[in-house]
């Protein structure tokens, strides 16, 4: 038996309220579902990516770099770090530095909500957390259709772009060069 819909505040709309069904998945269910997709894709191809959004742009990182996808966690602040490093979280006893990709890419800051997602990635045997607006999907990319680091004026520096791909709906997906995001002097904060 389905529960009746309720009225809930809609943060993304000019409407004050919208109907929400109890049966709609919440943030925890959506993250759990994506975790299962990530596990399945990691066992398949090296051409699988996890997509996420910042503002209206869609970005993707190689699925092999994804260690974990978690909801917002309490962040311990650190002094004397760049503004895009929000601090560290304790992930099962390991301190993981957290980078807000909006700030790293020069976008305006956004308040964290229950839908904010932390992508935990492993680069050179180090864990790093990336704050993203939301995680969208698992995408299998045909490498022959990737345009390598195009010369265009984008919101982010091209040093963080590995390439650009058009998905099945002809929407542009920006492939992020995860190792390029990490400069050793910026990431020693969690390993002192």
Predicted segments — roles?
Residues 1-192:
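An acidic, low-aromatic, low-complexity terminal/linker signal
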